[in-house]
């Protein structure tokens, strides 16, 4: 069996985009939409992405310019389950092991001696009954202002807002070897009665029914506001310049990671109830994998000032000062 030929393919990527641009002597705009699809060299692995972009720049008068930029993206990625290393499997698995039987059914070979029977493995079955997917969405908005207050003074301001959401799912159903190993029993075989065979329920069987669903959801909301005022003036051989500015940044992360058991994706993504007082090793498993909540916020404020004096384009004197504050710095006593 040529495992490399069965588990890998020629990577194929295609991208498409359309854009519109236009304007007049006071304003201009640009808009685009794009789509990309990447089928990775590994079967069952790929990425699909959509993105949009819009930019508008306008001159309100001869001294004030205003710009707006909005962009968004949506992507979906699929990978093999984290328990599967396709490259290692193709390299280490004997070529004498077939993928299918003579009747074209999947061929399963003994891979582990479970407590309630031999656990058999087939890589295609494993890829079909497990998965790992990532969904990512993001939107960014930026507004910038440029104001020529006077011939020797200029003010600029930039405000940026962004929001993103990442959802990850790593799952395996009860037909997979991954779950069979947790169950310590091959799929389809009746489990021992946990009352009559308490050792099986207390010491061996991690997950008697259903599969496993691990999910992680992370949301990020952030903004940046930057302002600066610059000055420059010349008096004969003297040239004076300087600037002052501030920047405020804030970023908030909210997330939840959870592992749920008894997952039945083929039955409407429902979950089966399992009594942890009867299946005691399962009860210990649930206790050892509590939900994890993420809730962090980072705030930063920066102030700066610069000044420069030049005489006769030969002698230069510079001055710089900056201060930063953050909720991560702690408190001074």
Language model region names:
Residues 12-16, 298-303:
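Conserved alpha/beta core surface patches that mediate binding of polyanionic ligands
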Residues 1, 40-45, 51, 55-138, ...:
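Surface-exposed loop/interface segments of Gram-negative outer-membrane beta-barrel transport/assembly proteins
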Residues 18-24, 52-58, 141-147, 227-231, ...:
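Residues on the lipid-exposed face of transmembrane beta-strands in outer-membrane beta-barrel proteins
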Residues 33-39, 317-329:
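Transmembrane beta-strand segments that form the barrel wall of outer-membrane beta-barrel proteins
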Residues 52-54, 157, 301-307, 311, ...:
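Extended, hydrophobic alpha-helical segments in both membrane/secreted and soluble proteins
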Residues 19, 30-32, 156, 241-245, ...:
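Structured core elements
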Residues 1-43, 81-83, 126-129, 146, ...:
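Residues embedded in well-ordered regular secondary structure
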Residues 13, 24-25, 61, 148-150, ...:
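Outer-membrane beta-barrel channels and translocator barrels
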